[in-house]
């Protein structure tokens, strides 16, 4: 009968409308790529793909044991000291800066001449069981060498100071080839080098002469971990040895020093503890 057919048509229309509405809701629920963003506890967001929604999919992926161990293992770079010398770094309270940056010693600002002392403090604190500040080794150098204070320290004075605290060192001129320089850097436990923008200005700008320290040579890419007390943007970065080689200041008596070894028995200082106002 006609009224029964009309009723069937009405039910069919209602069912089809409900199906269409359900499809629309599902389409809004999933994004265009068939993915759903599911918020989990904490700050993680897990992406779930349509058709593959499982209990595992809506949970954050577990962290592997090896990943946990890798995160817990400190990097060799973490144990390297890299002091900053200047007043600007101290004013900004940069990590590795200290009050010495704005202080005058023997009539001169430490920030103007302290790079050599930062280098020696880096070496002593990084390669031995002892620690010191740049100003500690500044005072020590005045006691054990003829360094008068209040200015840049010479190669010979730095070598005498380092020898007094247990290090075997060797002074070098710039080798004629980059390959020779790499070999000397690789053989040392660290290197103390003098760079100048007069020799190459690709990395150091407006730098007549500046001592920096090189640690942790990596033979896979021929880079070193740079301790640059004069520039926070250079400090604690890996730098190509080729960059260092090109910038070696050749108008100096010597161009770099290799830190060959350390003997605790020959360390006449054994400085324990760091006392001072600095950021770390």
Each predicted region: which residue ranges?
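Active-site-adjacent structural segments surrounding the nucleophilic cysteine of cysteine proteases
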Residues: 4, 8-148, 270, 279
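Noncatalytic regulatory segments and standalone regulatory/sensor domains
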Residues: 81, 88, 94, 217-280
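Extracytoplasmic/periplasmic, Sec-exported soluble proteins
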Residues: 107-116, 129, 146, 150-154, ...
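Extracytoplasmic/secreted envelope proteins and their assembly/folding machinery
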Residues: 116-124, 134, 138, 155, ...
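Sec/Tat-exported extracytoplasmic proteins
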Residues: 119, 123, 127-128, 145, ...
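Solvent-exposed loop/turn segments at secondary-structure junctions
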Residues: 122, 131, 143-148, 175-178, ...
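Mid-length scaffold segments of soluble, non-membrane domains
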Residues: 132, 139-175
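Active-site-adjacent substructure of cysteine-protease-like catalytic cores
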Residues: 174-225
């Amino acid at each position: 009968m006609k009224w029964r057919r009309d009723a069937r048509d009405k039910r069919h229309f209602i069912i089809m409308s409900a199906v269409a509405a359900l499809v629309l809701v599902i389409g809004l629920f999933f994004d265009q790529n068939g993915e759903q963003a599911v918020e989990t506890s904490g700050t993680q967001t897990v992406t779930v793909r349509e058709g593959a929604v499982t209990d595992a999919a809506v949970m954050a992926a577990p962290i592997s044991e090896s990943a946990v161990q890798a995160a817990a293992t400190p990097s060799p770079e973490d144990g390297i000291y890299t002091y900053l010398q200047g007043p600007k770094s101290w004013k900004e309270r940069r990590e590795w800066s200290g009050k010495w940056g704005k202080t005058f010693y023997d009539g001169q600002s430490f920030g103007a001449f302290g790079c050599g002392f930062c280098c020696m403090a880096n070496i002593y604190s990084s390669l031995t069981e002892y620690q010191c500040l740049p100003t500690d080794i500044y005072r020590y150098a005045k006691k054990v060498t003829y360094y008068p204070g209040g200015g840049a320290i010479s190669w010979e004075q730095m070598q005498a100071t380092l020898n007094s605290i247990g290090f075997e060192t060797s002074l070098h001129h710039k080798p004629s080839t980059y390959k020779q320089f790499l070999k000397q850097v690789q053989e040392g436990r660290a290197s103390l080098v003098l760079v100048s923008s007069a020799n190459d200005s690709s990395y150091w700008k407006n730098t007549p002469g500046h001592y920096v320290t090189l640690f942790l040579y990596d033979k896979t890419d021929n880079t070193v971990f740079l301790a640059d007390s004069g520039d926070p943007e250079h400090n604690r970065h890996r730098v190509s040895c080729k960059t260092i080689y090109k910038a070696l200041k050749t108008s100096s008596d010597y161009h770099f020093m290799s830190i060959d070894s350390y003997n605790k028995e020959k360390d006449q200082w054994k400085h324990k503890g760091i006392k001072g106002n600095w950021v770390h």
